[in-house]
């Protein structure tokens, strides 16, 4: 029970010392270590085998004790007395002295939790044989910041301070109880942390594979396995370790060893004097100078990539080294970037002298090296001399220049640019050539169309401004080479077109012999149409007549092959595959000189069969989407405005609405379509206005005749009805007699009359026949008048017998 109480008091004292450690570390500015009188010094054997070291570390750790905190035995005992007032203070001293004696004789390693200072620094832990509680101990000012263990192994020049004489940066690990504890290289190698002092003290590494060469100075070994320590001075080893998170500050004359556990362990009796620590300041200054000397030649990438810098004094040289390395690389990169574009241009040696060190002129050089080689060499060499603002203007020049100037007149362009300022010269020269492309093409065309001998004169002015030949050579490569903003067309004739249309011929004329029979595209089209495709024809107006596109300006014919497929892509519903298959197969002439005064150009193109009726209707409609669509470009839109809708898109159709082989006279298919009023043939839509008026008149006459016939029949029927009604009105008096005679009363009347006649005759029979007969008549009249007083007399007029 008494021993348990001592253990509890020890725990309380350890906790108080750990809490008081940050303030103590903050106050101490340099390492001052005092040894109490209860220290029992013991030398550790440096030749302890690795097996013994590893076996010694396998023992269970005793009670943890705080590390490298500035405290005294009196302070610890006083704090323990405050916490345990009922205990005797002398028992604590006896406990510590007994515990020190027991732990001194035992070689069991001891591990403890790290005690961090206010600056976030921690002492390294290790395995030591003696555990000594100093009366006043403070950590050295070279305490390093805690870093991960992985940081010790990733540095190439890292050296361990586990066996050196200063505090090294520990790696943070987790103890068995889950509490964080500091571990140095000795925790990973399980070796003895102390070494025996001799006249030439040598601190060995913590890994059994480490080979130590004889030396007169203390050498600090690294933590990496199979590391050979070469003879070196203390300042050199310290300088190398300053680069890595683990910092070692060694002194060959000092015999005091600060173990990884933070407990001071003397290695020799001669090293316990205080003046030894007075030389630590001098040693640190020498370390700083050595670090500065060593780091400058070793300013490599690992120096800048180390995340944790251990010694504050060594931080500045490391930053300087990293800054020096970056400054050294930056000029190299800048020189490469500046030199690269300049050397790529072969015409720059006289120009690169004033702008060799300028980085602002490099981007303009880049932009111009990609554009200006397409122009003349004189342009590229002179343009680079200008300022960056002026270079921007010169980069816009090759958009219209590259295909025109170098191909025709390079010598002429250079004299215009050299004597004048560079930006105005290309800007004034190139637009002049560009804008003069149309006037030479149009002006000669107006005067030279009537004859064919003027076509050479048209070619000569086109060659002079060096624009027309350029567009002719590049027509198959780029769309903008023909004309950027308009379609090449021929100006209309004044009055020849109107006079020729009034005299249509009765027989087709023969095409002129100087015109080609067909115009094929530059690339041969060998793909079949397919079952869903068909051929259509698109005729053009006088602006693109066949003579103009063949003999006078071939570029006008080339633009039909280029822009007509684009204009046909307007229709909604076409798939991408169908749009790709839209192409102009050929351009053929259609002889319309008798009707229109020129030979019509007809383009034969491919088109899906399913959309043929819609396209046919759109071509006939002036305001359809075929003419109004601009989504495929203004050039394609302008080309559709030159389509002649009077000629059907059905292949072979002519201006008269007949196939090309039928001619303009009667016969063949010509007698079928126009004369059939209800004809649904394809040629019915091409009927003339007179034919359509005739058909409408016939239809109207038929309807009128039918209406008149109906009205006449109605009148006749009505008159017949009225006549019949009048006839019935005249015989309406006999109607009651018919009613009377149609029934039994008539018979009865007849019978009664007969009876009366018999009666009267029988009565008056004897008097004579005549009288009886007369009596019979009078009696009948009397009987009729008596019995049928309401019936009129004319009954007997129609039928003397009285029957119907």
Curated annotation (Swiss-Prot):
Keywords of this entry: Cell membrane, Glycoprotein, Membrane, Signal, Transmembrane, Transmembrane helix, Vacuole, Virulence
Cytoplasmic side: 716-804
Main location: membrane
Protein name from the UniProt record: Cell surface sensor MSB2
Residues bearing carbohydrate: 45, 157, 298, 308, 357, 393, 427, 433, 629, 638, 669, 683, 686
Free-text note on domains in this protein's UniProt record: The extracellular serine/threonine rich region (STR) and the HKR11-MSB2 homology domain (HMH) are essential for MBS2 function, whereas the C-terminal cytoplasmic tail is dispensable for appressorium formation and virulence.
Biased composition range(s): Low complexity: 46-58, 69-80, 128-143, 150-169, 189-202, 395-407, 427-476, 672-686, 774-787
Species in which this protein is naturally found: Pyricularia oryzae (strain 70-15 / ATCC MYA-4617 / FGSC 8958)
Gene Ontology CC terms, in alphabetical order: cell surface; extracellular region; plasma membrane; site of polarized growth; vacuolar membrane
Induction field: Expression is significantly reduced when PMK1 or MST12 are disrupted.
Its membrane topology: Single-pass membrane protein
Localization per record: Cell membrane; Vacuole membrane
């Amino acid at each position: 029970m008494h021993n348990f109480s001592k253990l509890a008091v020890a725990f309380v004292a350890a906790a108080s010392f750990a809490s008081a450690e940050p303030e103590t570390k903050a106050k101490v500015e340099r390492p001052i270590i005092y040894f109490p009188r209860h220290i029992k010094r013991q030398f550790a054997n440096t030749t302890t085998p690795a097996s013994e070291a590893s076996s010694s570390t396998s023992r269970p750790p005793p009670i943890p004790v705080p590390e490298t905190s500035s405290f005294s035995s009196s302070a610890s005992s006083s704090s323990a007395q405050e916490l345990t007032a009922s205990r005797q203070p002398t028992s604590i001293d006896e406990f510590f002295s007994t515990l020190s004696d027991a732990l001194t004789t035992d070689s069991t390693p001891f591990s403890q939790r790290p005690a961090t200072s206010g600056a976030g620094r921690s002492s390294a832990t290790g395995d030591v044989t003696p555990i000594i509680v100093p009366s006043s101990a403070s950590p050295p000012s070279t305490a390093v910041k805690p870093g991960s263990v992985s940081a010790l192994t990733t540095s190439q020049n890292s050296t361990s301070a586990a066996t050196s004489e200063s505090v090294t940066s520990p790696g943070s690990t987790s103890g068995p109880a889950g509490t964080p504890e500091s571990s140095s290289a000795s925790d990973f190698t399980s070796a003895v942390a102390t070494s025996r002092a001799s006249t030439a003290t040598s601190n060995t590494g913590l890994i059994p594979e480490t080979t130590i060469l004889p030396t007169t100075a203390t050498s600090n070994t690294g933590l990496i396995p199979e590391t050979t320590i070469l003879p070196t001075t203390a300042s050199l080893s310290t300088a190398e370790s300053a680069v890595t998170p683990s910092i070692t500050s060694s002194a060959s004359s000092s015999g005091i060893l600060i173990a990884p556990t933070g407990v001071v362990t003397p290695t020799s009796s001669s090293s316990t004097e205080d003046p030894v620590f007075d030389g630590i300041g001098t040693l640190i200054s020498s370390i700083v100078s050595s670090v500065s000397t060593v780091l400058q030649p070793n300013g490599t990438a690992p120096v800048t990539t180390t995340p944790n810098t251990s010694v504050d004094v060594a931080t500045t040289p490391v930053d300087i080294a990293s800054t020096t390395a970056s400054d050294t690389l930056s000029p190299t990169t800048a020189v490469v970037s500046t030199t690269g574009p300049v050397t790529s241009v072969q015409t720059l040696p006289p120009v690169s002298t004033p702008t060799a060190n300028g980085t602002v002129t490099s981007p303009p050089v880049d932009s111009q090296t990609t554009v200006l080689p397409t122009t003349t060499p004189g342009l590229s060499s002179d343009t680079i001399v200008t300022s960056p603002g002026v270079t921007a203007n010169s980069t816009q020049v090759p958009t219209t220049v590259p295909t025109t100037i170098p191909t025709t007149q390079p010598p002429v362009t250079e004299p215009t640019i050299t004597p004048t300022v560079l930006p105005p010269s290309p800007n004034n020269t190139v637009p002049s050539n560009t804008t003069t492309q149309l006037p030479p093409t149009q002006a000669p065309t107006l005067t030279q169309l009537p004859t064919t001998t003027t076509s050479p004169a048209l070619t000569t002015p086109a060659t002079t401004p060096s624009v027309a030949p350029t567009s002719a050579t590049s027509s198959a490569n780029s769309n903008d080479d023909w004309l950027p903003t308009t379609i090449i067309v021929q100006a209309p004739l004044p009055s020849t077109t109107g006079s020729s249309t009034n005299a249509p011929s009765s027989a087709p004329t023969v095409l002129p012999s100087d015109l080609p029979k067909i115009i094929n595209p530059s690339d041969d089209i060998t793909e079949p149409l397919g079952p869903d495709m068909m051929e259509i024809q698109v005729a053009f107006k006088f602006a693109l007549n066949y003579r103009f596109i063949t003999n006078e300006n071939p570029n006008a014919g080339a633009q039909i092959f280029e822009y007509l497929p684009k204009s046909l892509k307007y229709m909604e519903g076409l798939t991408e595959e169908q749009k790709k298959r839209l192409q102009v197969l050929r351009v053929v002439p259609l002889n319309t000189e008798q009707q229109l005064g020129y030979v019509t150009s007809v383009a034969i193109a491919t088109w899906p069969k399913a959309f043929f009726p819609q396209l046919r209707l759109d071509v006939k409609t002036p305001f359809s989407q075929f003419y109004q669509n601009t989504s495929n470009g203004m050039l394609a839109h302008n080309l559709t405005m030159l389509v002649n809708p009077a000629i059907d898109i059905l292949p072979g159709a002519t201006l008269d609405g007949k196939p090309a082989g039928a001619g303009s006279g009667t016969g063949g298919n010509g007698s079928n379509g126009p004369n059939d009023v209800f004809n649904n043939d394809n040629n019915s839509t091409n009927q003339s206005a007179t034919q359509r008026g005739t058909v409408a008149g016939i239809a109207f006459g038929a309807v009128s005749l039918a209406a008149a016939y109906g009205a006449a029949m109605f009148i006749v029927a009505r008159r017949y009805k009225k006549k019949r009604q009048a006839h019935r009105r005249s015989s309406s008096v006999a109607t009651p007699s018919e009613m009377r005679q149609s029934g039994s009363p008539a018979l009865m009347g007849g019978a009664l009359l007969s009876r009366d006649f018999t009666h009267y005759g029988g009565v008056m029979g004897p008097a004579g026949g005549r009288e009886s007969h007369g009596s019979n008549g009078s009696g009948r009249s009397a009987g009729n008048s008596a019995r049928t007083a309401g019936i009129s007399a004319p009954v007997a007029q129609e039928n003397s017998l009285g029957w119907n």
